[in-house]
Curated annotation (Swiss-Prot):
InterPro entries: Rotavirus_A/C_NSP5
Phosphoserine sites (modified residues): S66, S155, S157, S165, S167
GO molecular function, one term: magnesium ion binding
Protein name: Non-structural protein 5
Post-translational changes noted in the entry: O-glycosylated.
Function: Plays an essential role in the viral genome replication. Participates, together with NSP2, in the formation of viral factories (viroplasms) which are large inclusions in the host cytoplasm where replication intermediates are assembled and viral RNA replication takes place. Orchestrates the recruitment of viroplasmic proteins such as capsid proteins to these factories.
Positions bound to Mg(2+): D91
Length: 199
């Protein structure tokens, strides 16, 4: 559950105004709203100074004084005031709150069913870091390993060297370096066999 309480905000007051206030209570969509608002009339000099200090281009709809000449000015200058016994309830309808004659505008609300987080995650995910190309290469290597003959000096013959399976296009059978390759391959095999025996 998530609970938000703004009743501990500091009170900000202005010395220009007198403590004249009235409270209104209304019901919207079944939710009870209790407010104690402060519409205080400052003296005429303060309002005149405020209006005269602004250029005509800066005066907009927020500076309107059509209904109550000083309402917009007083609300904007009064900032935020908090009190524990006035507020807005968002959880229960027809909730009564005690009203106060003190000039406070306050809002506190709680969300009991607002946020629910389920932190359990089913970890049935298997991740393979081997790509398809790597898998196919490994399979091909395994196939070729099975086909290789034992390392013997006698295996150096036409059956194992430079046949169609060893060449890409099958054109190496008539290579002029074939005999030299046979001799070199036989010598390398003998060296490898000797190293294996020594180890």
């Amino acid at each position: 559950s998530l609970s938000i309480d703004v009743t501990s905000l500091p009170s900000i007051s202005s010395s220009v105004y007198k403590n004249e206030s009235f409270s209104t209570t209304s019901t919207i969509s079944g939710k009870s709203i209790g407010r104690s608002e402060q519409y205080i009339s400052p003296d005429a000099e303060a309002f005149n100074k405020y209006m005269l200090s602004k250029s005509p281009e800066d005066i907009g709809p927020s500076d309107s004084a059509s209904n109550d000449p000083l309402t917009s000015f007083s609300i904007r200058s009064n900032a935020v005031k908090t009190n524990a016994d006035a507020g807005v309830s968002m959880d229960s309808s027809a909730q009564s709150r005690p009203s106060s004659d003190i000039g406070y505008d306050q809002m506190d609300f709680s969300l009991n069913k607002g946020i629910k987080i389920d932190a359990t995650v089913d970890s049935s995910i298997s991740i393979s870091t081997t790509s398809k190309k790597e898998k196919s290469k490994q399979e091909n290597k395994n196939k070729y390993k099975k086909c290789y003959p034992k390392i013997e000096a006698e295996s150096d013959s036409d059956d194992y060297v430079l046949d169609d399976s060893d060449s890409d296009d099958g054109k190496c059978k008539n290579c002029k370096y074939k005999k030299k390759y046979f001799a070199l391959r036989l010598r390398m095999k003998q060296v490898a066999m000797q190293l294996i025996k020594d180890l």
